[in-house]
Amino acid sequence: MRLNIAIFFGALFGALGVLLFLVAFGSDYWLLATEVAKCSGEQNIENVTFHHEGFFWRCWFNGIVEENDSNIWQFWYTNQPLWKNCTHAYLSPYPFLRGEHNSTSYDSAVIYRGFWAVLMLLGVVAVVTASFLIICAAPFTSHLLYKAGGGAYIAAGVLFALVVMLYVIWVQAVADLESYRHRKMRDCLDFSPSVLYGWSFFLAPAGIFFSLLAGLLFLIVGRHIQIHH
């Protein structure tokens, strides 16, 4: 009875982990950035460029926001324009844009982004493999498959933990937003970029928790089956 309960909750937590990881992987809201520029004589109107990016795409669109309005709601699906500019995020991670930068900082950014992308792909492969192993383990009550699936869930959790850490380091240090701001201020005296973590980013830690928990439960299940069968 206890074994069946452990398998049930392991499968539930594993399914939640897979769902959260796949949504975080496929959505383009790891980073939300707003660029506020006042280049005209109007003081109450702000011309804002909104950026959002994920694993596959980086998109941006322009908007006008009245003073004291919150910019964050512009990223909601229904508030976005029908047409917006998008490019592959791998070659143009914010705040860099392919073709506008021919410097070592851009090359370093692309390489860093490459490591981040590889870790995320490995995490997705690990969590999908774990699910497949657990599905195969259920009919045969195989302790080896349960242990392998549990280990794969834990590996996926560790890989996505590294993904989150690398992204935090990217936003806080590697992106060099201060240099980007100074470069933009050559054309506009008042320019202030603002960067926030998006909802895709926050899905990853939740997926990490459920994936690690599922992995531990399936390792316990595999150990129990090995001893008692």
From Swiss-Prot:
Pfam family of the protein (one): Claudin_2
Gene3D superfamilies, per database record: 1.20.140.150
Extracellular side: 27-114, 172-200
Cellular compartments annotated: Cell membrane
Signal peptide annotation: 1-26
Family of this protein: Belongs to the TMEM182 family.
Protein name per Swiss-Prot or TrEMBL: Transmembrane protein 182
Gene name tied to this protein: TMEM182
